């Protein structure tokens, strides 16, 4: 123990680290058999702060290469090779730009926000979620359809940054390097190509409100939400280094692109072209910024999304792969459900192809696969818990394309159609 008996019989206490007495410091904190003074506490805090800052810089220096990012995306997202390449390069350059800004330099690198365009169910949201997981940065998703201008009923755009803060546990420094994914951005287009003379608070008004946020501004964010707690202190968040990814299905944009490609010639010498029978995703590859303006995005908004990544329709092979290959594939999920009933669930190759074809016909992409499987297996899942000796359920092409029930294999190996309650 750091004590010393003086001549007058009183014990003087000393700091166990620097050796100063209790009379030389403002505060001496006692621990089990040791003491530490306020000066040593401050010194320790400075050391920890510096080491934390240094380790943080090292972590941000190690940005994965575009090939590494693309390889991880391949593990989670089926197909979309071109979109993955565009995203991998854009994200790598974004975080390289942040490291460049930390080190200082004469040339300031501009931010490149990303616009993902593709049919519904093709993997736009999953790509953004996977990117955030790879980079280990705060990530939040916002639905553009719920946003309105400040002062109107609905969500303010600042709430997007509040969600990002919440995902970073209110660590402002970390949130300022995060990723924001704004879904359904095609639903906030203005109603006509010409500027509106009336207020459009959920369309063009939201685009205007998002401009500064996406370009870079210091946003005043209410930690508890702005409208219910008007007296609270605001947090200041700089959005300059936040990467914004916007996504949408843009239904009808393919017709605008196709019309631009056709032209409108008339007469005997006109170049008459047939109907464009390409898929929506293929047509999107010919996208130009002017097409987005015709669709209803304002020029300033398009200008703040310089990186365009178009996603293709998922073909039959891709949908079959989605059904069977990923770690949490739908087929594996239903097989696990049947295992809980001590029954094996199998799908024939023809059945998987038929399920994929039906999803393509519905134009729902990968998102519609679960509802198709539910339709096929509903009666079987209803009857199975009350049946005994069923060891296997086989889904064949007939069960997918007609009202026939999947086959049930009993312990005696005889096959019979499943009875629909």
Curated annotation (Swiss-Prot):
SUPFAM superfamilies, alphabetized: Glucocorticoid receptor-like (DNA-binding domain), P-loop containing nucleoside triphosphate hydrolases
Domain ClpX-type ZB: 3-56
Nucleotide-binding listed as a keyword: yes
Keywords: ATP-binding, Chaperone, Metal-binding, Nucleotide-binding, Zinc
Cross-referenced Pfam families: AAA_2, ClpB_D2-small, zf-C4_ClpX
InterPro entries: AAA+_ATPase, ATP-dep_Clp_protease_ClpX, ATPase_AAA_core, Clp_ATPase_C, Clp_protease_ATP-bd_su_ClpX, ClpX_bact, P-loop_NTPase, Znf_CppX_C4
GO molecular function: ATP binding; ATP hydrolysis activity; ATP-dependent protein folding chaperone; protein dimerization activity; unfolded protein binding; zinc ion binding
Entry binding sites for Zn(2+): 15, 18, 37, 40
GO CC, alphabetical: HslUV protease complex
Binding site for ATP: 119-126
Family in the record: Belongs to the ClpX chaperone family.
Protein name as catalogued: ATP-dependent Clp protease ATP-binding subunit ClpX
Organism taxonomic ancestry: Bacteria, Pseudomonadati, Pseudomonadota, Alphaproteobacteria, Rhodobacterales
Designated gene of the protein: clpX
């Amino acid at each position: 123990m750091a004590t010393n008996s003086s001549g007058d019989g009183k014990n003087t206490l000393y700091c166990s680290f620097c050796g100063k007495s209790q009379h030389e410091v403002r505060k001496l904190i006692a621990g089990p058999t040791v003491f530490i003074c306020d000066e040593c506490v401050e010194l320790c805090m400075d050391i920890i702060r510096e080491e934390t800052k240094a380790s943080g810089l090292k972590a941000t220096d190690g940005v994965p290469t575009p090939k590494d990012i693309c390889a991880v995306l391949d593990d989670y997202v089926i197909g979309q090779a071109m979109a993955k390449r565009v995203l991998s390069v854009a994200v790598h350059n974004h975080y390289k730009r942040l490291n460049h800004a930390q080190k200082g330099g004469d040339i300031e690198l501009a931010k490149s926000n990303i616009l993902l365009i593709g049919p519904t169910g093709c993997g736009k949201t999953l790509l953004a979620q996977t990117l955030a997981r790879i980079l280990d940065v705060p990530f939040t998703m916002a639905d553009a359809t719920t946003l309105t201008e400040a002062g109107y009923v609905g969500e303010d755009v600042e709430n997007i940054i509040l969600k990002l803060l919440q995902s970073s546990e209110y660590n402002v420094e970390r949130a300022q390097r995060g990723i924001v994914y704004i879904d359904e951005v095609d639903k906030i287009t203005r109603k006509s190509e010409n500027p509106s003379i009336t207020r459009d608070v959920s369309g063009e008004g939201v685009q205007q409100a998002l401009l500064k946020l996406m370009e870079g501004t210091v946003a005043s964010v209410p930690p508890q939400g702005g409208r219910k707690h008007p007296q609270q202190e605001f947090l200041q968040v700089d959005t300059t280094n936040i990467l914004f990814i916007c996504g949408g299905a843009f239904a009808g944009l393919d017709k605008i692109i196709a019309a631009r490609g056709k032209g409108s010639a008339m007469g005997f010498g006109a170049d008459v072209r047939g109907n464009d029978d390409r898929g929506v995703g293929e047509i999107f590859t010919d996208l130009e910024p002017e097409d987005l303006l015709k669709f209803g995005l304002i020029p300033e908004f398009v200008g703040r999304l310089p990186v365009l990544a178009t996603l293709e329709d998922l073909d039959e092979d891709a949908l079959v792969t989605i059904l069977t290959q990923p770690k949490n594939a739908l087929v594996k999920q239903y097989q696990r459900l049947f295992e809980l009933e001590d029954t094996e669930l199998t799908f024939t190759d023809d059945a998987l192809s038929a399920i994929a074809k039906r999803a393509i016909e519905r134009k729902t992409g990968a998102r519609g696969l679960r509802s198709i499987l539910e339709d096929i297996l509903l009666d079987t899942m209803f009857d199975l818990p009350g049946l005994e000796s069923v060891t296997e359920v086989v889904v064949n092409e007939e069960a997918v394309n007609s009202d026939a029930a999947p086959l049930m294999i009993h312990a005696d190996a005889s096959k019979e159609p499943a009875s629909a309650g």
